[in-house]
């Protein structure tokens, strides 16, 4: 009896294998990149000395790879945007050279996550944002505004409760914490069962809850999920099992099998956590994600079946921030955990982000039209690419269209070729994908014109043929292939205008109670300086919108970010005197940055015989301690949370077993009571307690200046500003002594929220450390950067505090 093979349409798309020749080409290409970086080091008389195991790959591959074809964006991330063309001879140092003088050109944007096209502000929504920027505190937002957004968002998503978070990354951390605490309250073991292709933030969220167990199941594999659920029911019958999935997966574009998962839920009664980061305002008739996607296909998938749902405002909505929705018992626990975080002084969403959320969800008819338009355009692109023989990993109608290209080299070449033709697309490469499963990632926007959609399809096919992507045949489509009828949005203009007018009136009502120029909100600026910063924010908004809509590593960066990072890098002469050339990096969420920073520096050292001793005070912020203890215990690393110096005496005794050790020390520059760190004596006391100084190979000093910047120093520029005024630019040599200073790496970390009432965080350190950390930091690699508006306002504030000086 012959076997009937299923047709292609019934097969699950998988990444094809990579030929031996292409693997060989990749290794030669990777070696070329590494040797080119080595030659640049030699010409600059530099000898790179890696401090940790991961640093070598960062310096010789990931950093130069990311700078082969850098994208510097100088307009809003709309469907068409302006980018700077960086000459190849200066691309490896693009953030240190005169990028503003480089020529710019307009390209079609198919690389960011602006699926709904909401970076183009509809009707009167831009007026609402500008009014809020000028008349209300930037951050913290009025509490009643935050409460209103949480209530209306819960209603829109048909949830019992909603809590806001500073980032989508932070939203997942809060969601997993809520599940773990719910299990603890019911005296049950918590077990997280995650889809293996879930977001990095979901894995981090699971890892941070140390009392919980953690397992993976194969991507979208219902049989594997059922097997693991049945096993857990037999081995841990009383456990609270949480199945965590994404609604739509960003590096495949496929949607989770929600109907099948809900069927399993009826049998095993597990908690269901769904991350709708890429599907919120991207799929579903009302933009509510994967459940609506399946409802439109005839399945009964009520949103009430979700126990916890996370979403982000950083992607399709075009801002920065996250949302956590919850039902039943998880709703009250979510509100409790969110309240605890606020009481501990956590950041909160800025006023303009909250108003942008309101301007959107109060226009349900407008959203419905956008979602229909988006699916129509996404389906057209997918069908044409499929017709040309492209192996799509995403289903028709998904706004993320992914197809495999094999190696990192092929992915990099594909992106570069598209950019030459005027189209910006993205790619998925390690660590986000397996080494031989790199993908091209094309994002469809509802606002992209049909002419650009057609040109995009033809470009993708042409580049695929040029690079010999398996299965793709040469084809060119014309306007006759386009749908005859497109959806118009003008019929919902009455709804949009009325909603925005009501919100403008609400801004004015709030401004009477919470004026923007309140002394506490604008400190350390005076009223005139604050007005200048507000107007600079308005100008930035008019040019860039609010948010970046995508991750820098996979998409590109904005000239605004580079200017702020350059200013931060030159802010402290004492740090430059000690470290040499400095660099800075930005993040949208200071807490998440702290987790990533401490997790990265707690890794093993490059020298195998050196113990990395990480010392963190017990009174350090919660997220600092969680980051330091995030990863599994390794024999080459020891993390110690100490109350006082007596705890370190025990640690000093243990050090006798090790020939060499390196100390990573976290210190806050200003305590809660306002006392300023005596760095010299603190270091001396700690090293004296360890009693093994001759074996010390190095010191990494992490100075948390969150309570310093904007508060202390003659220019209100923080701890180092204060120390430089007292000890000069040789402060570190004086405080540490020349011998210890020579082996010390200084890292300055801070929160814009606690210092300037802005949003997000920053890191400043030596060029070597900062470059390596742009790869080792999970928050930098996988999280959306800060709001462009906020970065511009922070840069202007630093300029004013520094006395109006230009870039150092």
From Swiss-Prot:
PANTHER family with a match to the protein in the record? CLASS II AMINOTRANSFERASE/8-AMINO-7-OXONONANOATE SYNTHASE
Question: What is the designated name of this protein?
Answer: Aminotransferase ALT4
Stated role:
Aminotransferase; part of the gene cluster that mediates the biosynthesis of the host-selective toxins (HSTs) AAL-toxins, sphinganine-analog mycotoxins responsible for Alternaria stem canker on tomato by the tomato pathotype. ALT1 also selectively transfers methyl groups at the first and the third cycle of chain elongation for AAL toxin.
Its required cofactor(s), as named, are:
pyridoxal 5'-phosphate
**Entry keyword Nucleotide-binding:** no
Q: Name one Pfam family in it.
A: Aminotran_1_2
Q: In which pathway does it act?
A: Mycotoxin biosynthesis
**What EC number(s) are associated with this protein in UniProt?**
2.3.1.-
| Domain of life, source organism | Eukaryota
Q: Where does this protein come from, organism-wise?
A: Alternaria alternata (Alternaria rot fungus)
For this protein, the record's InterPro entries field holds: Aminotransferase_I/II_large, AON_synthase_class-II, PyrdxlP-dep_Trfase, PyrdxlP-dep_Trfase_major, PyrdxlP-dep_Trfase_small
One annotated GO molecular function: pyridoxal phosphate binding
Q: What is the phylogenetic placement of the source species in the record?
A: Eukaryota, Fungi, Dikarya, Ascomycota, Pezizomycotina
Which processes are annotated in GO (biological process)? biosynthetic process
Q: What else is known?
A: Gene clusters encoding host-selective toxins (HSTs) are localized on conditionally dispensable chromosomes (CDCs), also called supernumerary chromosomes, where they are present in multiple copies. The CDCs are not essential for saprophytic growth but controls host-selective pathogenicity.
Keyword set, alphabetical order: Transferase
Family membership, please give it: Belongs to the class-II pyridoxal-phosphate-dependent aminotransferase family. BioF subfamily.
